[in-house]
Structures are given as C-alpha cells and as structure tokens.
C-alpha cells in the first residue's frame, strides 16, 4: 500500500492522517498528527476465536521522548503506564467496544504510541481518532467509526478541544465520544454546572464528533480493506428452544427473588441442575464441550431476557423497587477513632457499602506527577479498592487494576470541585475508599463516603457531594431509565450512567453503554432523574453531618502559614537545604514552601509551630528606614560600631552618629555587648544598613556641624591601597573570603568592611585613620 495523506482543519488545528507508510504488517495502522502531537495507532486481530468473551485490549503508551524528556528512575526506561495513560486507554476502549458484533470472540489489540506531544493538542483525542480509523480501514470486523472530543465551557460558550490556558479557565472538563448517530461515552468533571449546561456540552461535543466521523468515512472509502470473514459464536437454536421450553419458568422464579444472595443462590442451583441434566444426556458425545458452552450462553441469555422483561413490561425490578426508587440509605461518621485517623465516613446503599478514610499531610507529601506535561504536585488523591470479599468471592489480590484506577479517578473528579483552595487549607489530602459490600454503584458509594470523611475530618468543603448510577433498558424503540442500578441491572442493562454533584450542580459524569449509542432525550431524562435521586442522598448525608467540623481531628497535623517574599525563599531554605533542615531539627516540624512564598508549617505541637514561624519571620525580616531598634553592640571599630538589629541583620553606627558632641573614641560611648537604641537612616542598594544613635536624641541648642575637610587626591587613584590599615584590612579580607566560600548561604549578612571603611574615609576625611601620603 502506498503512502496516503489526508488533512482537514479541526477546532483551530490541522488534523493530518497518514496511511500505508509504517506498521504495514498490522491489520490496520495510521499516523495521526494533530497540531504538533503525533500518535501511531496499530490494530491487530488474532486468527481464531478464543474463550467465551471478547478479548479487546487497548493501550495508550506515553513515550517520554515525545516531550523531549528522559524517563525517571534508575533504568531510565518507560515502565508501567501512568495513571493518565491508563485512564486514556479506558476512555478509548469504552466507545469502540460496542462497535463489534455480538458473538465476536477473536482477540483484538489496539496500541496507541505517542511519538510527539503538544500539550495544546490532545493526545487522547488523536489516539481515539486513530484507534477508530485503524480498525475501520483494517480487515477487522468493526461495525462503524467512532470519534471523541474534549469540551470546555467558558463564559457561556462551549469550546471544542481547548488549549491548556482554556482548560484552566473552564468550569468544565468533558470528554465525549460517539458514532454518527448517537453518543456512547462520557467522562467529565465540572464545577457544579446545571443539567442544562451539561446536556448542551454533550450535544456540542457530538456535533464535533460527527465532523470527525465524516472525515474517517472519506479515508475508509479510499484506503479501507475488505472485512475478514470471522466465525461468530452462535448457539444451537434447537438446543436453545428445548432448554427455554423446559426450564424458563424455573429460572424466572429464581430471578424474581428480591434479596441478592438468595436470588444468586437460587439461580445458580437452577443452572447447575440444568447443566447436570445435559452433561449426563451428552456424556458420550464428542461435542460435549461445545454443547456445554452453548448451554452456558443460553442460560445467561434466559436470565438476561427475564430481567429486561420484568422491567420493561411489568415495571418490576429484581429487588422489587420502583423504576425511580433508591435502595435504603445509611450514613455514619467516625467509624474509626479520631485520635488515630483523621476522618472516616461509612456509606451504605442497599447491599453496596463503602468506607472512606481521610488522611491529611503537608504539601511535601503530595504526589509528584512527571509525565509528558511539566512536572507538578498533585494535592488531592482519591483511591478506590475493591476486594473480592465485597461480593463474597475469592480472587486476585494485588496492585489496583484498570477498573479500580478508573473508579478512583471518577471519585477524585467529583470531590475535587468542592475542595478549599490551597491558601484556605494548605494540606495534601488523601481519601481511600474500601468497598466492603457491592451490589452495583460502588464507585458512587465511594463518593458519598468520601464526602462524609471530608466533613468529619474538618476539611472545609464548599458543599456535600453525592453520586448516583442510572441505568437503561432499551429495545431500540421503547426504553426505561432506572434510578440507582444494582449489579444485575448493570450486568444485563444497556447503560451505566454515573452522575455526581451538589445541590447546586453536577461535579462529575461517566457513561458506559453496551448499545451503539443513546439519544439526547434519554440523556436529558437520565440527568433529571439523577438530580432527584442526588438530592435524596444529600438529605441523608446532611442529616448525619450538616457542615464540616470546625476542628481537625486531634491526630491530624496542625498547620500555620506565613507568606514570605519570593526573593527570601532561598534564605529560608539555605544552601543545600541547610537552613530549613536546621529549623526542622530544632523544632520537629515539617515545612513546605511553594513558589509563591506561601510557607506552611506542620506539627502536632502548636508550640513547635510557633517557634518555627518565629525563626522564619526573623530570617526574612528586613530593616526599614525610620524604624527604631534596641540593638546590641557586636563589634567595635575605630570608625564606629556594628550593632545587631535582629536575627542576622546588623547595622553600622558611624562614630559621628553616636552623639552630637564630637567623639574621639568609640568606646567612650559604647562597649561591646551594650544595648543601644538606634534609628535606621539609610539602606544602600547592597542591603547595607546605616543607623544612628544621636538621631534619637534632641540636637543641642546652637549645635554646628563640623566642617568637612576636602579629600586629598592619591597618586595611585585607589583609596583601597596603602599601608594605613593593612592589619584591619586583612581581617576584613578574611570575613569576605568566608562569605565567598559560603556562596549564597542563607542568613549570612556579614559586611564588606573594607569598602565601608573606604566609603567613610571619602565622606568624612577628618575622621580618616589613613596615614597621609
């Protein structure tokens, strides 16, 4: 295949697609260039059908070279995918999965590799476009193209594929995907936006999606391959009819049992009995394994059909609820002792239960994110764990999988919209949700439990957040929207539409569907039902705890802040962290300083915080002209005295500024260690401070300033040379050498006394101690 190039202008950038040049052994491959972002997508298919499910794998690989960066770590090589890469892979998987035929069982891999990265041209948009197009032009049986875009909302306007600056200004971060006819994937975080605004964003996004799909269709028409003939899994229709006729009523009775565990037990017993009958019947048949495989599919289909029939025809749900009814709710705080943990919330909805635990820490404990974008600190983390015991099973135990990462991220988006600013609450915040029981909607239970934990822990959130999962049963013509779906309705339904928010608006959306797409009318109805349900849940949460506690838990670190000038940050930190380490060692606190000069001090001991704050204040304190100090004499020279104002800030009192009367000897007025009152008279551009004692004493009546003698010109023209003060000069050189050796060490305020001495000789020649030349 020869190289082909296609281009359009889309959302303010050039979108270019190249085919036929690279990865030619894959079933389908494209290079997508969007702005300066380049993504290579390759799609491949296994030769044979495998297993009893569709093994689709979508990867999104972030190569650090794409941003001109080295990977971190000892090996300097990309390792496991980042959280963002995992979420992007899920984002692509969800809209393309429904586009494969029922019964398709060949393994399919779609690998997206980011080759160059432009932060203002979304890699996930390019990868989703490339994934669909690589499948569409290949011989892999892919039903129809999909595409996705990002949507922002600024000042009442929807913006497609916003830049970084636009994202920062936006009250909405939405990813929406679909086919030419309908939306089939939604992922969003929002700052309490109304249902109407969110629906408008979805429609604006879908209109943009249609443009991308039309572009794909043009490319497929020119370079698309003929689709391969693959074997789809079809059950024996005679066997199906036989089983339904003999056992459908038994399975219906089991499915209609309202309590989950009893229903599961009864359903399992019916299925096992049927399998036992047919295992014995076909014991000697060489196709027994195929018969049993078909039988499992038939029984699953019978259960699927009965659940949907009950809902659409009888308007009865498996647990007996009405279509828009929420399961029984319960909320509790302080599940664990407050003198140990920082805040806990236990939320129960029917047989779904989540425990969320809050931990607060200094900002230096925040997660450092180093990906294709610039490194930054992530302040808020929401982690979701789903142990197998929550559904009464045994199973894999280990690192979180894609599902757990995705559910944690959804809760994070929902809750971060109501968190106080860093200035208001300078803590790193971690919530961990442990799913203790699950019968559907556990991610939304984790959001409700997280709200309880935040409020119980004293985090001043703007408003409580609740989440609800909406479902859909549709036959293509008629549909039913379900409120608060349970596991069976999720498994056999067509949609899982999660909506989280406050009383003022939506903070997060996530939608997965198993059909090709849903209409705006269904979305509007689902959002309206979700709002009603959300308010009911908020009633229960607010009845448990109406407002965030005013005090943190006794176990939580206390905090105080002090804002320091940006140019003083290095003073507090010190060379190699020497100064800040000294403060920490002396007081036992933790200190975090951001780039704006906000210094946060953490400790469980308020006295330690106060002491550290005092030390920092002294380090960054600056003398100002006109201020008066009780200063200690720390060094005496023939031309004046050096006094300490505070901390390491010294000032010089010239001999002429000690008294109104002429002073012949400095020590006639002050002694080393004396405390004297001085007034700041001048601060030069190098930060050297001149002070006066006599300025605080009333000038004697008839006082006349002594006449200044003109300065004699020296032949060599350099007032710093000569023999008059060699001994003292050498002493000054030692101080200056010390200063140079220390570099920029924080807090070193030693004076370059030789220059100061020359300055005095020049302005007050009558006081000069230099020998005449």
Swiss-Prot record:
Mg(2+) binds at residues 490, 496. Residues 557-616 form the KH domain. Residues 700-773 are annotated as: Disordered. GO terms for cellular component: cytosol. Residues 739-748 have a biased composition (Low complexity). PROSITE patterns: KH_TYPE_1, S1. Its cofactor is Mg(2+). PANTHER family: POLYRIBONUCLEOTIDE NUCLEOTIDYLTRANSFERASE, POLYRIBONUCLEOTIDE NUCLEOTIDYLTRANSFERASE 1, MITOCHONDRIAL. This is Polyribonucleotide nucleotidyltransferase.
